[in-house]
């Protein structure tokens, strides 16, 4: 498909927005899902200070702005800011006219019905798109891995979901949600670095800690054993240079931080870890399809990017599942963007073209059309 009539694929995550053209193998634009507003009134007249900034520009001016994330735990909570993010996506990042392209949007599993309707309404009424569709994020990740049946453990910045999918349909009764994801791990790393004597407090410093987390953290196969290794030698220590040139050293924090995914009690949470949540999700499904789910457990999202996470999941789920069960954890290298990639694949299939909600259908039925056509 050429860009002239190509569909646009927009994956709105709690932390990052991924956008591009259907048929491409990676998103063209990836930017933070933030809207920033100046903390103080501009001093100089005629400086042309804007009343809001979006994405990277908001990030780079974060010192003078109040930053807000319109998507919390995967679900849109502030529609005015969300509209600003979409506007920025179309006009500044992709540089396209939305009224000329069909748009595929993604949504969190168990997204409230009113939210899908609001998305649909904004696309047709504010941006005048010719056609649109709303797809569930985890289902797209599964498509991207070349499967139509499996269970997806999707963990991003704001929320983690385990979503069993059979023949392309998510099974809503068995979807589980865990409000523990990348942002919580960043906060936890800030906390345990403070214990080492490094203080990180502001929203700007949180971004530095996020970078440390992404570059140096990993998941231990055996947590207790790794703690022992860290205590008895300095082999696990790594150093990181802060923007001001100061060098800090981190040791057991490297694996203590993501360990919270498996032991949420580290964060003072009573929920099950990601391994147990995945197992519970499988157990909520029909006994006949469990075997297919165990053998097709797909990891997706930025918070599954830690080295060692697939081996640890394999080990933990093996100990929970029936002894003879074949368990396979699939961790595609591109899983950070697999939701977007799945959307790109779906929107460029010839069989999908009749699935779009057209402007005409919307005008006839109103926003509720989305429940009939997108499931």
UniProtKB/Swiss-Prot annotation:
EC number(s) on record?
3.6.4.-
Q: Which SUPFAM superfamilies match?
A: Actin-like ATPase domain
Keyword list (alphabetical) reads: Acetylation, ATP-binding, Cytoplasm, Cytoskeleton, Hydrolase, Methylation, Nucleotide-binding, Nucleus, Oxidation
**InterPro entries, per the entry:** Actin (IPR004000), Actin/actin-like_CS (IPR020902), Actin_CS (IPR004001), ATPase_NBD (IPR043129)
Q: Which residues carry this modification: N-acetylmethionine?
A: 1
**Cell compartments where the protein resides:** Cytoplasm, Cytoskeleton; Nucleus
Keyword Cell inner membrane carried by entry: no
For the modification Tele-methylhistidine, the affected residues are: 73
Give the catalysed reaction(s), semicolon-separated. ATP + H2O = ADP + phosphate + H(+)
Give the Gene Ontology MF terms in alphabetical order: ATP binding; hydrolase activity
N-acetylaspartate, modified sites:
2
Q: How is it modified after translation?
A: Oxidation of Met-44 and Met-47 by MICALs (mical1, mical2 or mical3) to form methionine sulfoxide promotes actin filament depolymerization. Mical1 and mical2 produce the (R)-S-oxide form. The (R)-S-oxide form is reverted by msrb1 and msrb2, which promote actin repolymerization. Methylation at His-73 by SETD3. Methylation stabilizes actin filaments.
Record flagged with keyword ATP-binding: yes
Question: Which residues are modified to Methionine (R)-sulfoxide?
Answer: 44, 47
- One GO cellular component from the entry? dense body
Q: What does this protein do?
A: Actin is a highly conserved protein that polymerizes to produce filaments that form cross-linked networks in the cytoplasm of cells. Actin exists in both monomeric (G-actin) and polymeric (F-actin) forms, both forms playing key functions, such as cell motility and contraction. In addition to their role in the cytoplasmic cytoskeleton, G- and F-actin also localize in the nucleus, and regulate gene transcription and motility and repair of damaged DNA.
Q: What does the annotation say about its assembly with partners? A: Polymerization of globular actin (G-actin) leads to a structural filament (F-actin) in the form of a two-stranded helix. Each actin can bind to 4 others.
Q: Which family does it belong to?
A: Belongs to the actin family.
Comment field (misc): There are three different beta-cytoplasmic actins in Fugu rubripes.
Q: Per its record, how is this protein called by name?
A: Actin, cytoplasmic 2
Species classification: Eukaryota, Metazoa, Chordata, Craniata, Vertebrata
User: Gene name on record?
Assistant: actbb
């Amino acid at each position: 498909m050429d860009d002239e009539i190509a569909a646009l694929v927009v994956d709105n995550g709690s932390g990052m927005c991924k956008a591009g053209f259907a048929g491409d193998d990676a998103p063209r634009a990836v930017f933070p899902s933030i809207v920033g507003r100046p903390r103080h009134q501009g001093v100089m007249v005629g400086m042309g200070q804007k009343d809001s900034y979006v994405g990277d520009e908001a990030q780079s001016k974060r010192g003078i702005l109040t930053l807000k994330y319109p998507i919390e735990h995967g679900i849109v909570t502030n529609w005015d800011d969300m509209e600003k993010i979409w506007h920025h996506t179309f006009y500044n990042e992709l540089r396209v006219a939305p009224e000329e392209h069909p748009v595929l949007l993604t949504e969190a599993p168990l997204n409230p019905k009113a939210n899908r309707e609001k998305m649909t309404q904004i696309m047709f009424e504010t941006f005048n798109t010719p056609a649109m569709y709303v797809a569930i994020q985890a289902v797209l990740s599964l498509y991207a891995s070349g499967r139509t049946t499996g269970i997806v453990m999707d963990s991003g910045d704001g929320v983690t979901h385990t979503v069993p999918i059979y023949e392309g349909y998510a099974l809503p009764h068995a979807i589980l949600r865990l409000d523990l994801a990348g942002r919580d791990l960043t906060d936890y790393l800030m906390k345990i670095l403070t214990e080492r004597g490094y203080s990180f407090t502001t929203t700007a410093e949180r971004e530095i800690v996020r970078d440390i987390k992404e570059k140096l953290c990993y998941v231990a196969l055996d947590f207790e054993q790794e703690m022992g290794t860290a205590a008895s030698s300095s082999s696990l220590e790594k150093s990181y240079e802060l923007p001001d040139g100061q060098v800090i050293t981190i040791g057991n924090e490297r694996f203590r931080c993501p360990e919270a995914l498996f032991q949420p009690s580290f964060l003072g949470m009573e929920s099950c870890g990601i391994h147990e949540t995945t197992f519970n999700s499988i157990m909520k499904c029909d006994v006949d399809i469990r075997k297919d789910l165990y053998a097709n457990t797909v990891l997706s999202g930025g918070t599954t990017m830690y080295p060692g996470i697939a081996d640890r999941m394999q080990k933990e789920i093996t100990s929970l599942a029936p002894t003879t069960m074949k368990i396979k954890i699939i961790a595609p290298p591109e899983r950070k963007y697999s939701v977007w990639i799945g959307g790109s694949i779906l929107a460029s299939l010839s069989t999908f073209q009749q699935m779009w909600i057209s402007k005409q259908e919307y005008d006839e039925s109103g926003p509720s059309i989305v429940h009939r056509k997108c499931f």
